[in-house]
């Protein structure tokens, strides 16, 4: 079910937005940033019901290279300077206090879930990436995730 949603709905939509796919993860290079959209399948999924959740992340290859060495050819949400769950984007709450939500996909609701995911990416994830177009904006989002500024801004 999720494989069909990814193949038939998400992959074509993300390809049109210049994302490249590897497994359940998509990357798009945008200036100094790499945008990441990642889907995770739950281990407890069955053939009748699959459970998924999603993440968005923004990676900065130059930062990663300074700290860890060469950047990977493909980034995951764990490589990001920050990542947010789809649930956080959906609820417009990037504080880190939103509880995680797993989508339960069954044969009878797979088309509805596909539409929900496509809408979330188009109306939440892409505008989120667009809002993070400078290091100042990226720092604001990191501070949002950490609960506010504890030190003066680095980029100003």
Predicted regions: what they are:
Residues 14:
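Pyridoxal 5′-phosphate
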């Amino acid at each position: 079910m999720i494989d069909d949603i990814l193949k038939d709905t998400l992959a074509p939509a993300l390809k049109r937005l210049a994302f490249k796919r590897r497994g359940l993860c998509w990357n798009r290079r945008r200036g100094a940033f790499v945008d990441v959209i990642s889907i995770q399948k739950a281990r407890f999924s069955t053939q009748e019901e699959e459970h998924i959740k999603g993440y968005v992340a923004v990676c900065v290859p130059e930062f990663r290279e300074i700290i860890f060495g060469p950047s990977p050819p493909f980034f995951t949400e764990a490589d990001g300077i920050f990542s947010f769950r789809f649930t956080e984007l959906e609820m417009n709450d990037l504080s880190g206090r939103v509880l995680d939500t797993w989508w339960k996909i069954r044969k009878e609701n797979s088309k509805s879930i596909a539409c929900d995911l496509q809408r979330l990416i188009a109306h939440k994830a892409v505008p989120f990436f667009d809002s993070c177009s400078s290091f100042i904006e990226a720092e604001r989002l990191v501070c949002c995730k950490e609960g506010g500024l504890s030190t003066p801004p680095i980029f100003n």
